[in-house]
Swiss-Prot record:
This is LPS-assembly protein LptD. It holds the Pfam family LptD_N. InterPro entries: LipoPS_assembly_LptD, LptD, LptD_C, OstA-like_N. It comes from Salmonella typhimurium (strain LT2 / SGSC1412 / ATCC 700720). Contains two intramolecular disulfide bonds. One of its GO terms (cellular component) is cell outer membrane. HAMAP family: LPS_assembly_LptD. The keyword Disulfide bond applies.
Length: 786
């Protein structure tokens, strides 16, 4: 489990968060202009076995004990080189040692260098046997990477594994600029373990010290090390001033944790955000526990609840054991329905409407798999809306393909539904679905003929309250059996032609598709709707077997779906263009018998549902993607979306977007506790733009703006300005986003946030502007159209 950790030393010695190259390559090359490189041939092997070469203007000595070299002295052994005005060579034969100890004292313009560091000073010392080196009152410069400083004494130890500074400083800024630096009474840099220990550490901006720590152990490479991560601060209208100081804990090679004290001024307390990651034989996962001991804003708004502890628990796990067992967890739970309105979290959003708590254990071998799961929902609705949970659910699949010309499958499910309210219907549902399929195909087409039988039994309880309510049109039954056969024929053809006359090397395909589907009508009014909703229908969705998800509503069908797709490929077999158009023609009305589904009373037949999708890669920099669905049952265009993007590179892009969803479509496809929310009563009709562009040398701007034409108000706004240099980066951002709905005042609630970040750069090879991360962190995230 690898994780690149930019810790507090990264704050101090230039570890960067962002990974895009774009303009970063230019900046990196500029920064390296002031960094020396090792230009001699690299020597490998034991340097003690290599000869020592000495050049000087003058030499005198007392062989074999000592020698003095003066004038342009140059000593080389392996990758190490020592230069000075004068060098005194001493050689002593220690008792019991086969090799003599050779040391040198260097005076005047001392210069030591190897493939890792350059040391300069007025006085130096070196042990030619161990390669230990001292330079007093000098400067040092890293080789091949940013990093330089000064020290009263600089030492190389352990075959150049350790660099030790006494009263030393470090900065990654280029020569001539000391924007920031770290100073310590002693600094030990271990290259093998990629860690630095600093005693009496002072962090300076210019000449001014702004931070002190008596001891720091900090990572300086890619190895995971415990330490503080880069702090962050911002100001929001819902929490006022916020400050984060994350600490990374490298527990073991297969597990780590990040502990973040998150101070929120308006809440009057610190939220402790704790993330734990692990990798075991049973799989990998992430756990998050966020805890706020008290919240004065929430307590003022909800005085009857008293001292409120607010929290979030998240657990995601995925694993396989012994190649047959599958374990999965997707669990999110919060203390109250307002949690995601009040706090930003990567594990949920106020626009989600609910949180899911799901556990599953599966077993899979060839031709067979079975899964036992439980699923619950926490609805973020103050109106005490009910929701159903599956406690538990068993799904079983058995496959037997190549049974002569046929493929067969048997699917089974057993589930028990429980409601959060005591007066709502509950049920046990058992479903069995055998299927036989005759697949025929070759390189230019395919024909699949399928027949299945869907048998379902319901045992429903707690029906008295529902059946006695005069507002409920359907009367539920205690025991219901439903048996429905299904027959389907699906045929595809692929025609291909060379476009030599219009575009040499290009190829066009034409792919017509026809599907006939028959499902007889069964009255399902006596069955409560526990888990079914209308499925979204893009072009591929037209060819589904089902109109509804789940098993409680299986609509009758006597219909033909027709569609056609054409694609254009260039001479490198890259798809440059495609367009698909299809429709469903109903010979008879599609029904379930549920009087609560209003369009079932319209008795409509004919061509009712149309859908189309298109993609056009206009050039290497321009792309267009669009889709539309028209549903006469909903009396309107159900959904549509378009996206046009110009993308020059990863830091230069402009994208224009349009998205629409009718209110009828939202009510039909989303759960009632979500779709009936006031903010969706007029549907969704938004236009927007996303952009990222460098505006000057090392300056870049990113922004996103979405406007809701139904309410004539902005839906989301984001603007960020960034400056990037060799030794630091600055980012200022503003965001205004939708954060809920005020039912009393009947208007949307917005949150405004201003953020400010400073990142110090240096040893990392990462000089990206980070524009993609800013765009994707938006509440309406950027998605490429290319």
């Amino acid at each position: 489990m690898k994780k690149r950790i930019p810790t507090l030393l990264a704050t101090m010695i230039a570890s960067a968060l962002y990974s895009h190259q774009g303009l970063a390559a230019d900046l990196a090359s500029q920064c390296m202009l002031g960094v020396p490189s090792y230009d001699r041939p690299l020597v490998k092997g034991d340097t003690n076995d290599l000869p020592v070469t000495i050049n000087a203007d003058n030499a005198k000595g007392n062989y074999p004990d000592d020698a003095v070299f003066t004038g342009n002295v140059d000593i080389m052994q392996g990758n190490s080189r020592l230069q000075a005005d004068e060098v005194q060579l001493h050689q002593k034969q220690a008792e019991g040692q086969p090799e003599p100890v050779r040391t040198v004292d260097a005076l005047g313009n001392v210069h030591y260098d190897d493939n890792q560091v350059i040391l300069k000073g007025p006085k130096g010392w070196a042990n030619l046997n161990t390669k230990d080196t001292n330079v007093w009152e000098g400067d040092y410069q890293m080789v091949g990477r940013q990093g330089r400083g000064k020290a009263d004494l600089m030492k190389q130890r352990g075959e150049n594994r350790y660099t030790i500074l006494e009263n030393g400083s470090f900065t990654s800024c280029l020569p001539g600029s000391d924007t920031w630096s770290v100073v310590g009474s002693e600094v030990i840099h271990d290259r093998e373990e990629q860690v630095a220990e600093i005693w009496n550490a002072r962090f300076k901006v210019g000449p001014v010290p702004i931070f002190y720590s008596p001891y720091l152990q900090l990572p300086v490479g890619d190895k995971r090390r415990s330490g503080f991560l880069i702090p962050n601060a911002k100001y929001t209208t819902k929490n006022y001033f916020e400050f984060y100081l994350p600490y990374y804990w490298n527990i073991a090679p297969n597990m780590d944790a990040t502990i973040t004290p998150h101070y929120m001024h308006r809440r009057g307390n610190i939220m402790w955000e704790n993330e734990f990651r692990y990798l075991t034989q049973a799989g990998e996962g992430v756990m998050e526990l966020d805890y706020l001991p008290s919240d004065k804003v929430y307590e003022d708004d909800h005085p009857k609840e008293g001292d409120k502890h607010r929290w979030l628990f998240y657990w995601q796990h995925s694993g396989v054991m012994d190649q047959v067992w599958r374990f999965n967890v997707d669990y999110t739970k919060v203390s109250d329905s307002s949690y995601f309105n009040d706090f930003d979290s990567k594990y949920g959003s106020s626009t989600d409407g609910y949180a899911t708590q799901k556990f599953s254990v599966g077993y899979a071998v060839q031709n067979f798999d079975a899964t036992v799961s439980t699923k619950q929902f926490q609805v973020f609705n103050d109106q005490n809306t009910s929701s159903y949970s599956a406690e538990p659910q068993l799904d079983v699949n058995y496959y037997h393909n190549d049974l002569g010309p046929f493929d067969t499958r048997i699917y089974g499910q057993a589930v028990h539904f429980v409601n959060t309210k005591d007066n709502m219907p509950e049920a046990t549902r058992v479903h069995l679905e055998p299927t036989i399929n005759l697949p025929l195909s070759n390189r230019w087409g395919s024909l699949n003929t399928e027949a299945k039988l869907m048998a379902t039994h319901y045992q429903q309880t707690n029906l008295d309250s529902y059946n006695s309510d005069p507002n409920n049109k359907n009367k539920l039954e205690d025991s219901v059996n439903r048996v429905m056969p299904q027959f389907k024929v699906d045929g595809k053809l692929i025609f291909e032609r060379d476009m030599a006359m219009l575009a040499p090397g290009y190829t066009q395909t034409l792919e017509p598709r026809v599907q006939y589907l028959y499902v007889p009508y069964r009255d399902q009014s006596g069955i409560y709707n526990y888990d079914s909703s209308l499925l979204q229908s893009d072009y591929n969705g037209l060819f589904r077997d089902r109109t509804y998800g789940g098993l409680d509503r299986i609509a009758s069908a006597n219909q033909v779906t027709t569609g056609v797709t054409t694609r254009i490929y260039d001479d490198a077999a890259v798809e440059r263009f495609n367009v698909s158009v299809g429709q469903i023609y109903y010979f008879t009305e599609s029904r379930t018998g549920d009087d609560n589904i209003k369009w079932e009373n319209d008795d409509k037949t004919g061509s009712l549902v149309w859908a189309g999708d298109t993609y056009w890669r206009i050039s290497e920099r321009w792309g267009l993607r669009s889709g539309v669905q028209y549903d006469t049952r909903l009396d309107s265009v159900a959904t549509s979306s378009s996206s046009l993007e110009y993308r020059r590179d990863q830091d230069r892009l402009v994208q224009l977007n349009y998205r629409y969803a009718s209110p009828e479509y939202i009510q039909a496809t989303l759960p009632s506790y979500y779709s009936t929310a006031e903010q969706y009563k007029n549907g969704i009709n938004q236009v927007g733009a996303v952009a990222s562009w460098p505006i000057a040398d090392r300056w870049s701007i990113v922004g996103a703006y979405y406007f809701d034409t139904n309410s004539s108000k902005p839906a989301d706004q984001m603007l960020g300005l960034q400056y990037n240099s060799c030794c630091y980066a600055i980012r200022v951002g503003y965001e205004r986003k939708l954060n809920g709905w005020d039912n009393d005042k009947q208007h949307a609630i917005y949150d405004n946030a201003i953020g400010f970040n400073i990142e110090l750069r240096g040893l990392s090879s990462n000089y990206g502007l980070g524009t993609q991360e800013m765009l994707r962190s938006n509440i309406l995230p950027y998605q490429s159209s290319m």
